[in-house]
């Protein structure tokens, strides 16, 4: 901003500030710059004008130019040299200008005005730039030492705020410059800068009293300290603030030769990188290098300095509570790069710690076994599965199963292999296999079904199975083998479980099988016949006792996984109803010889069911016999399918072609006459009745018309007559006046 000041020898006066783009005339009378009591001053003595040589205000090196043009009689002198009349010359700061030949001496000075704005919207910046342009100042995008003011609506801890406080520059509202412009235009005193301090809007500061005026203590706040930056982006952002405060900013590159004593030296502050910040791009090697430096600091009892503490140390003018590696971190300080650290987000064994009790993310190992092997092995790559709505028992079970090591996996595989030999030698009645619902697989995605199957297969009691092998291997042999069949085989063998489900209320044998099937369905397993033993169609007493013991063992798993598979129960119920209807229809079509065969089969091998049938009613007996016969028939069919399961193809993909264009077939109702074919497509119209359509139109006339009788206005007629007389009299007078100036008024016509 250019100012015209009176010289020291001249009479003291107020400085005259010159706005950009305005011409100031220096003269003796009716001028912007008025000089009185000097007879050598002309009325239009000289002209002063401030112009910008460039259109961009962000170029801080280019200041506006001040030019002067002499139009006087006695001349204008610049540094005691007379100017040529009618020519312009450029003035520099400090030049002495003399108007006339007497004591009208002045001095021109340029007062720097470089404004940097922070946290302003687009409209606020536009208004600010216009005011600065008229004042002859400049604007800067980033803070430099040449900046004189910082414009903010509210004080927040930013890099520009820190630099402005360190440099001792005032922080003002944008309205200050608008009021300053009005004061210059009206030639009044400029506003007080203290009344335009913005309010503090920073949660880290709170309600604490802070002095934001220029303090000398801030200029040497970081004297004797060395701030070590491990990232180039942080060094570029915060390095200038450290240097302004008298400190040293040093960028540490990866693979440097600095010793460990350098980081633990007094006055050395290692700035925290903030690995969890998504804006920073950190490679794996840099991450390891940063962790190594953090371990060095931890061994020496030091801590890294967050970015926010640099600003708080400048605001509160202390380095004891802030930017002190040996001190405790402040609880109210929030780093500039928020987010959990790596140690908080990921544990050592690789599992994810849940952030909320009802939204839990864990790594569940993929337990899909190979087709030819009955042993269950854990995959090396865990599969992430999200489980919602688990109770405390299931969470404990998840945490316990997620920490299985590879050694225990190998031992479990060996135990499973040993138990598999027992299964093949003794050939028990039923085996346990992973259960897959074909109805659910058609309606759900493959990914969700695979995650659900992995959860079911994984949470089977492996530890209990090894303990029971040592006590009684014969009883636990059914639990130790788990074979995963193809989808086609499971769809054919699955109705054996639900068919036994229906007869739970009538006979003891079906009730026992119902418990086993429910336990297996809740635990994610399905009961299917083995078919290799000769007595696979009968149920022995020892097997029933063993299954009762298994029910006690599986009770805990039922409670844990009841919430997981609650959605599958409606689907199983629907499937059981459909299969029951199909069985009833097939039974009605069977001949009487099949019914006799059914009674013969039910009479021999199951004595317990016969005793239960004798106690029930006659109608219930027939229903149970039909149900048991259908169950055994399905068991026999399943045996044949299991024998030929090795020849069946596995892992097939069902493809179905669908048309991508969906259109509705517009059906036309064609009316056909007798012998005339199709009728023509024509439309029927009907006149809509409007009000008054059936009446004659109402014609205005006759009595509807009223005669208009004009009244005579006597006053108006008298006024018109008077005006006519006045005009006639005026015409006569005009004609008489014209006759007086005629040379020959009476011209005789020949």
From Swiss-Prot:
Residues 446-457 have a biased composition (Polar residues). Residues 429-479, 494-550, 581-622 are annotated as: Disordered. It is found in: Nucleus; Chromosome; Nucleus, PML body; Chromosome, Telomere. One of its GO terms (biological process) is response to xenobiotic stimulus. Present at approximately equal levels in the heart at fetal day 17, at relatively constant levels at postnatal days 10, 17 and 21 and at slightly lower levels in the adult heart. Barely detectable in the brain. Not detected in kidney, very low levels in liver and skeletal muscle and moderate levels in heart, lung and brain (at protein level). There is a cross-link at residues 436, 683, 687, 732 (Glycyl lysine isopeptide (Lys-Gly) (interchain with G-Cter in ubiquitin)). Residues 502-514, 540-550, 581-599 have a biased composition (Basic and acidic residues). Residues 111-328 are annotated as: Mediates interaction with SP100. The modification Phosphothreonine is found at residue 337. There is a cross-link at residues 528, 569, 580 (Glycyl lysine isopeptide (Lys-Gly) (interchain with G-Cter in SUMO2)). GO terms for molecular function: chromatin-protein adaptor activity; damaged DNA binding; DNA-binding transcription factor binding; histone binding; phosphorylation-dependent protein binding; protein serine/threonine kinase activator activity. One of its GO terms (cellular component) is nucleus. This is Nibrin.
